[in-house]
């Protein structure tokens, strides 16, 4: 196998979610995160964009989405891209 870089968009449950605390919770529970930033969406809502490196296993995308769904304050997780590292 190899490694893949995954770009994710994390949507909080509401505009009232403390994004700094949510980022800290994500870093505490998920390994392999290379970059994380807040991106304004509109109407007072922001998303968290994450770049992470993980093993290229079958079903890796589903595993990643499942991992983030267990963190309180997250409404949904979208994988924007998944690319194999050379």
Swiss-Prot record:
UniProt keyword annotations, A-Z: Elongation factor, Protein biosynthesis
Molecular function per GO: translation elongation factor activity
Gene3D superfamilies according to UniProt: 3.30.70.60
A Pfam family of this chain: EF1_GNE
Entry's transmembrane regions: none
Cited InterPro entries: eEF-1beta-like_sf, EF1B_bsu/dsu_GNE, Transl_elong_EF1B/ribsomal_bS6, Transl_elong_EF1B_B_arc
PANTHER family with a match to the protein in the record: ELONGATION FACTOR 1-BETA
Protein family per UniProt: Belongs to the EF-1-beta/EF-1-delta family.
Function description: Promotes the exchange of GDP for GTP in EF-1-alpha/GDP, thus allowing the regeneration of EF-1-alpha/GTP that could then be used to form the ternary complex EF-1-alpha/GTP/AAtRNA.
Name of the protein in question: Elongation factor 1-beta
Organism of origin: Methanocorpusculum labreanum (strain ATCC 43576 / DSM 4855 / Z)
């Amino acid at each position: 196998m190899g490694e893949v870089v995954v770009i994710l968009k994390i949507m909080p449950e509401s505009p009232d979610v403390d994004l700094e605390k949510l980022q800290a919770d994500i870093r505490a529970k998920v390994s392999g995160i290379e970059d994380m930033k807040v991106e304004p969406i509109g109407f007072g809502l922001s998303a968290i964009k994450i770049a992470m490196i993980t093993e290229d296993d079958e079903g890796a995308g589903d595993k990643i989405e499942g991992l983030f769904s267990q963190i309180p304050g997250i409404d949904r997780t979208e994988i924007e891209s998944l690319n194999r590292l050379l």
